[in-house]
From Swiss-Prot:
Binding residue positions for Zn(2+) 1: H63, H65, H143, D213
UniProt keywords, alphabetically: Endonuclease, Hydrolase, Metal-binding, Nuclease, tRNA processing, Zinc
Protein species of origin: Lactococcus lactis subsp. cremoris (strain MG1363)
Protein name as annotated: Ribonuclease Z
Upper classification of the organism: Bacteria, Bacillati, Bacillota, Bacilli, Lactobacillales
InterPro entries given in the database record: Metallo-B-lactamas, RibonucZ/Hydroxyglut_hydro, RNase_Z/BN
Free-text cofactor note: Binds 2 Zn(2+) ions.
Pfam families: Lactamase_B (PF00753)
Domain of life: Bacteria
Length: 307
């Protein structure tokens, strides 16, 4: 898994930071990309990456403020144009009202999509998605309007098959290897091959938590518990805690406190006020690292491998 930030600014675009959008790239795990929020000009930012819109199969919206959703109608339309040969359905998760917003934009603009949008409007905490390899949980944060955070949990995967040991034990390479990998006991040439003797320990899945705008809250700690990566907003420097609270946001220190309390491995800060440019960004990093050392302030198009 990899994460890439398409926009890291707060409120409105600036010369150095676009509005909010984050791509969780799971190409190796499921050949998909999941998008978290879709602020204005997100599709333009995508043009500066290797992301293919048709690979985006799920979009998770944290809340309905414009800097998190104004890019949706344009992106959804362009996804249809750019994916004419492979029209795959898209799942859209978000607060109640996201369906009305999207459909109104498409209807008024006369836009017609070549794929289906499956809307999943959320009004309470809980598990919102599960398949054989992933689960997604959501909970309510503390912002000025209804706002969500998301916890993406990769399920543990079967360990590596020791092919050399099987060959040395007399099992020829072929379909029987696959059966053992699936956990089946195999009898061959008078011998019994038990999977537990030839498969290593399970590979522990990654946990990624991506939060919308929020004050410091215990909900954030729960969503981020023992996560490999936490993406937390840090609109303000530590000295502006009163302003942060008044506007429903967090400071660098508050975000780092959440990461520390939750036992998070890596903390990436986003939703940075336009007032922080140049050396001031370094100040934000230092403030957070004083509390949680493994912290970085993301910038537009920044990408890193998770774990």
């Amino acid at each position: 898994m990899e994460i890439q930030f398409l926009g890291t600014g707060a409120g409105q675009p600036s010369k150095s930071r676009n509005t909010q959008a984050i791509a969780l790239k799971m190409l190796d795990e499921r050949n998909e990309i999941w998008l978290f929020d879709c602020g204005e000009a997100s599709q333009h930012q995508i043009l500066n990456t290797a992301i293919k819109p048709r690979k985006i199969t799920k979009i998770f919206i944290t809340h309905l403020h414009g800097d998190h959703i104004f890019g949706l109608p344009g992106f959804l339309s362009s996804r249809s144009f750019q994916s004419s040969d492979e029209q795959t359905d898209l799942d859209l998760y978000g607060p109640v009202g996201i369906k009305e917003f999207v459909l109104a934009g498409l209807r008024i603009s006369g836009s017609h999509l070549g794929y289906r949008i499956n809307f999943h409007e959320i009004d309470s905490a809980g598990k919102i998605f599960e398949d054989d390899s992933f689960e997604v949980y959501t909970d309510l944060l503390d912002h000025t309007i209804f706002c969500l955070g998301y916890r993406v949990v990769e399920k543990n995967r079967v360990g590596e098959l020791d092919a050399n040991a099987l060959k040395e034990a007399g099992l020829p390479f072929g379909p029987l290897f696959g059966k053992i990998k699936k956990g089946e006991v195999v009898d061959y040439d008078g011998k019994t091959f038990d999977p537990k003797d030839y498969i290593g320990a399970d590979k522990v899945g990654k946990i990624v938590t991506i939060l919308g705008d929020t004050r410091k809250t215990n909900t954030a700690v729960r969503l981020a518990w023992q996560a490999d990566l936490l993406v937390h907003e840090a609109t303000y420097e530590a000295a502006e805690s009163k302003m942060a609270r008044a506007h429903g946001h967090s400071t660098t220190k508050q975000a780092a406190d959440v990461a520390k309390e939750a036992g998070v491995n890596r903390l990436l800060l986003t939703h940075i006020s336009a007032r922080y440019v140049g050396p001031l960004v370094g100040q934000l990093v230092r403030e957070a690292q004083d509390v949680h050392a493994n912290t970085f302030v993301a910038k537009d198009l920044y990408e890193e491998k998770i774990g």
